[in-house]
Amino acid sequence: MKLLGLYINIPWPTKRYKYHDFKFPEYKKKINEKKYIHHLLQDLKKDSLLVPNRTINTIFIGGIAPNFFKLTSIKYLLKKIKNIIPISKNAENTIEFHISKLSEKKIFYYKKFGINRFSIRIQTFDQKKFNSLSKVHISKNILHKIKKINIEKFKNINLDLIYGLPKQSLQEALLDLKTAISLKPNHISWCEFYIEKNNNNYKNLSKSCNLNIIWKIFLQGEKLLKKSGYKKYEISSYSKTNYQCLHNLNYWKFGDYLGIGCNAHGKITQKNGKIIKTIKNKNLKKFMNGKYTYKNHIISKKNLSLEFFMNRLRLNTPIYRKDFKKYTYISEFYIKNEIKQAIEQNYLIETKKYWKMTSKGIQFLDSLLEIFIT
């Protein structure tokens, strides 16, 4: 049986990172946690009907800052989920942390509730740059807050960093990475800064560092991570042995997952091979009134191959040919022309067992994916 993930979206607080493009309405009044969790559970009850007799293998509580919720709220949520759908005894259960609400006390209690992986959104250790990106400013030194947490004691912790920030130098970016490595987490997410053009803060935050500097940051950062014992297994994810994020791996392998909460997305494979995409209402008010689903649709054959490769090509591993049919229920014959074109343009190499990106394919990933669009 394929793995099944559960993504829980908690899209608060209303003050977020300025570069995010989420379209949630801003609420001046504090939103009732108890009411939102009630609707999360009702949403899960409906979605659980799509996956009869299946067990949850990974849980990811995200949405930028779910740790703004009270401890009692998270405890209640996890307890009630078990009454709706079975959870594997060995499930990986992750929660995201906003740095401003980070505390060892919270991590300690989360562990008691069954959470065994923690993802801390640092973005940068440079306090001025952090405050220029985040609508939630912090007065205390970021590194000091992290050092108060015994990372080695809690083991399964991810530190989330961004490079190529506005006006960031090569030295500043590498210092961020060296600082994160010195804290000895078993997982580091390290991705390039990006902001949508339609974001209200685009003019202020789009003055990124020079492309040549970004390339140097990437090359030197990759060497630094490798030298420090971190293996790259996805475009922006690096881990020590046995500490890959199983939830994200399932996602990038084109596995199934339920998505509950405002603006959450899910993907479910039916017994007949049809694959359903679920999209929840991004209007928080409507969601809180019980209108959970915005749209459910079956992914067409044409789009299935594109979505499969969009996900799988993010992983730093060969794509086994048998997996294409396993996850899409489509014969490899259906994409023979696209594969042939990708090989001819030196984006992919093909063996009897797998396809693998060439260095050119990695460098021109968007061009490779365009082959599956036409």
From Swiss-Prot:
SUPFAM superfamilies: Radical SAM enzymes (SSF102114)
InterPro entries: Coproporphyrinogen-III_oxidase (IPR034505), Elp3/MiaA/NifB-like_rSAM (IPR006638), HemN_C (IPR010723), HemW-like (IPR004559), rSAM (IPR007197)
Keywords: Cytoplasm
A cellular component term, taken from the record's GO annotations: cytoplasm
Entry-linked Pfam families: HemN_C (PF06969)
Gene Ontology terms, MF aspect: 4 iron, 4 sulfur cluster binding; coproporphyrinogen oxidase activity
Family of this protein: Belongs to the anaerobic coproporphyrinogen-III oxidase family. HemW subfamily.
Function comment: Might be a heme chaperone; in E.coli heme binds independently of binding to [4Fe-4S] or S-adenosyl-L-methionine.
Protein name: Putative heme chaperone HemW-like protein
Gene name for this UniProt entry: hemW
